[in-house]
Amino acid sequence: MGEQMTIATKQQPSSQSRGLLITGLIIAMLFAALDGTIVGTAMPRIVGELGGLGVMTWLTTAYMLTSTTMVPIAGKLADLLGRKVVYITGLIIFMVGSVLCGFTDSMTQLIVYRGLQGIGGGIMMPMALIIIGDLFTGKERAKWQGVFGALYGLSSVIGPPVGGYIVDALNWRWVFYINLPIGIIATIFIAMGLKKHKVTGPIKIDFAGITTMIIGVVSMLLALTFGGKEYAWFSWQVIGLMTVSIVAIASFIRIEKKTEEPILPVNLFANKIFSSLNGVGFLMSVGMFGAIMFVPLFMQGVVGISPSESGAIMTPMMLTMILTSVVGSRMVYRWGVKKQILVGMIIMATGFGFLTSMGIDTTKLTATSFMMVIGLGMGLVMPIITLALQESFPKSQLGVVTSSSQFFRSIGGTFGVTILGSVMNAKSASLLTDYLLPLLHKLPSQAKGMVDQIAMEIHTNPQGLYSMLFSPEAMQKVPESVRDQLIPVLKHSMVESLHVVFMVSFGIVLVGAILTLWLPHIPLGSARKVTQENSVNESPPVMEK
């Protein structure tokens, strides 16, 4: 191999610098994590002023596309160029995107600027955990990984009320403007606390790998986003995007095998620890969306509670996850990585098993307790995956392996939304054909016009019928004689459909638990030495004099 660039590291920062740095990391982590939940709260006001209801979801999709794609790229650039320059660049991009979002006067502009925000957010997402991996080893590293995991979970709890307060007290534009002063404070602390790295040797950035990865990942995410919604799964648009994705990813793999400084070294996947941990993280995220997306749907559509009440059911789950993230980061030194992840995945799967018992008479307390079981399992697993990866690879690969865990979890979340949504749509449509269509022939003849319309909807737009469960106004337009027959069938069909979704989630998480059995023993602690098996393309860091 030709001359290879190495990064020089200074001595560990002083306690004062470390305090400034950790404060900056906490501020940056919170305001970046809060952004997603706060923006969701402001969405109705944004649409009310700018219009664009039909493209509203692209405010989330644009951010997701760019942030997910940037995560592995940021991790590698942090290894090549140093943490400080990459992190501060991400902060600046995020702040610029936020200000532009606040100044926008059209929904199209806002979507573009959300994509710019996502680039900054995708750089910031892995950097805090990478820097924690640099600063600490052993139990201290585990403790801080748990703390930052808890902070990320906390953002989902406090985000909606904070967003609502900002929108009510000021206006929706301040949801974005508020990022500027907070971001400046975080940048100052990080700039003061984070030591500069001196790069020796030529910097060889894998531009071909970056390009093919962006094309491959974005095309795949767009196909998953469009499939079954804007376009049919076998439409030329979706098939075309998947074809582009496959070709680009194949090209990416070929490039990564040959380049000196690959964005994601392909031979890492031959490492059992790397593959198993990221596989577990991917499957956990796929299954997780069975709870996050579909339990509120169940409680609103079947049980009949309000959106705010169904949202409140999620809060105890997140609080349980936060608590077990912190406790689990300490327990892992007693239990070991393999045992703790296995126990966490089994607990999470058990929670999904409980969800399959829910019915029309399920109480909020029952649903909340089931969600807390899932949160308990998630908290035991999520921070440990990143910790175990950091403890298993040399420091020069810390950026790559840390960002990989976040990347595969993000991709898993997207797959989860798509797979579980498709399962629900397919099952619910077939159930209406089985249950509702025969019932229509028994309805009074005076309701023939409405009956014919419903029969057509069963074949052309079954989800439109289910949406009536979430709209009392729409249901009131249906004649009472039809409504009394229609509502029980719709609820029964939704219960069966969501039971299938929860069973699929159960199976996916259980596969993740089985995959954990392939994990070798992962020693933890500062005295641990990295084995040759885990060292891939390793070059020792050059210590700055």
Where do the PLM segments sit?
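Transmembrane-helix exit segments and adjacent C-terminal regions of multi-pass membrane proteins
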Residues: 2-21, 25, 251, 387, ...
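Transmembrane core module of solute transporters
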Residues: 18-71, 75, 109, 151, ...
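Helix-loop junctions on the cytosolic side of multi-pass membrane transporters
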Residues: 188-207, 254-263, 360, 426, ...
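Small-residue-rich alpha-helical segments with characteristic i,i+4
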Residues: 158-160, 367-456, 502
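C-terminal membrane-cytosol helix-exit motif in multi-pass small-molecule transporters
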Residues: 181-198, 214-226, 244-258, 513-520
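Helix-loop-helix hairpins in multi-pass membrane proteins, especially solute transporters
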Residues: 48, 71-209, 213, 226
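A generic transmembrane-helix signature of 12-TM secondary carrier transporters
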Residues: 29, 91, 95-98, 113-114, ...
